[in-house]
Every structure is written in C-alpha cells, then in structure tokens.
Amino acid sequence: MPPEPARRPLKKAVESAEKMLARLTEQMDGVLARLADPAIYSRPGTVVTELQKEKARLEREVANAEKRWLSAQEALEAAA
C-alpha cells in the first residue's frame, strides 16, 4: 500500500467529486420540483422551456461528475 501522503490527492479528488455530485443533485431536485408544479404550465412565457434546458444541462453535468467520481474512486482503490 502506498504511504498516506501519496493517496491524499486521490482522496481529495474523490471527495471533490462527491461534493460536486451533491451540489448538482440538489440543483436538479429544485428544477424537478418546479417542473412538477402544475401552475408553472399555465404561465405564459418561457419558464418551462428554460427549466427543461436547465434540467438537460444538469443531467449532462451529473453524468460527467459521476464519471469523474468513478475514475477517482478507481484510482484510489488501485492505490490501496
């Protein structure tokens, strides 16, 4: 097993990816809650369209963050 200082950057990468996933998930929950509100669909304008675009953006970011987390986790496990 490599010494702890050698693993520290790998642990930080995993923790950073986990924090990013948590932040993105929280944002996604907010967007989904707004899209679940029936009242939003009776309003004129582009609110729904903008929320759908935001949802799609967040879905892409979550997928990328999950890949970064998995890669970091695998590197940490390989260093064990």
Model-based region annotation:
Residues M1-A80:
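Charged, heptad-repeat coiled-coil alpha-helices that serve as long linker/dimerization "arms"
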